[in-house]
Amino acid sequence: IVIVPVIYIFGMAFSNIRTDIPNQLWPENPNLEAFRYLFNETNFKKWYWNTLSIALINMFVGTVLITGAAYVFARFSFKGKKAGLLTILVLQAFPSFMGLIAMYVLFWKFNLLGQPRALSILYIGGSIPGNLWLIKGFLSQIPKDLDESAMIDGANKFQIFVRIILPLAVPILTFVAVSMFMGPWMDYMLPGYLLRFEPLNAPDGYDISNQWTLAVGLFRFINDLNYRHFSAFAAGAILVGLPITALYMAFQKYLIEGIMAGATKG
């Protein structure tokens, strides 16, 4: 059930089918025409860079901000703590598409329409509620005796956070970081809605496809009759899956530990 569709996608990627879906699992004469078409006749490299930059910003900046906030909620007592946690919990119940109009107005007011990297603001904000609760639940299970012992030895709060808390939280942080990388990687809704407008003061003859992400660009190959190319779509899908596969292979141990930790400590 799983292997056959994968083989079919690979077979389609190595064929040269532009308008019709191939009716065989593997082409009789495999070739690289679809890959050449992607790199030579489209802005695929630009789409890839736009998506990769958004995902990396979301992963690094988002993980740092969420980890810091989760540490504060897990280790400190302050006025409004319970209300803040309750608010974050409630925000998880609302789907992201409910805020599309507000997102458009926000981007329009700040002249961010057509700016791919600006999407990171929305992705980071949208990932805060669930991931903050996940990391906060993990950090709350780390004994506070470790903090007190370190303070007796002369460590301050920042040193405790960096030298004790972070090393112990590597599994859950890795899980959250990879999840935040995957979030914008193949998302179509936000870029499809906010990147269809030209940026402010765009020059004459501006190619709007330069600001697309992978999802928006690849979807054109199966949705636009003038550019329909199923083999190019399949070839792009294979290249899209490479970073995710590499991340899972590199951090498999930590991801499994993070999933288990989230299931038992969240």
Identify the role of each PLM range.
Residues 1-266:
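A structural signal for multi-pass alpha-helical bundles of membrane permease subunits
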